[in-house]
């Protein structure tokens, strides 16, 4: 498959030291198009959408923000904490706007498992179906997110 300049430029922006210290691709050797295709299939197989996942992350982020960095337990199963830094970061897909530099740490209390995401990550999931590459510090595995955050497939007829 011949790669287009558009995708090569996006991938370049995701490399370490460009927008973030560690980059967004981790140790994933696949092309960005392959990462997107694989995650699209994974999310579809779960019966949810990128928007469903992003909305749940956005809702939890809002709760964490309201606590100004202090931990908060939500729904008796999730402990949230947010770390915010000055500034903002652009979308590597050249999407308009910028995301605040914020990292949310979410511990699933029954299992002790942790999920970590960023505000930019929420945008990239919703607008681009991008969960970051394997090995990236902020890679969000769709299956884990759906399971640990209790994201349910929409019922037929739900809007």
Language model features by range: what are they?
Residues 1-159:
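Alpha-helical interaction/linker modules in multidomain eukaryotic proteins
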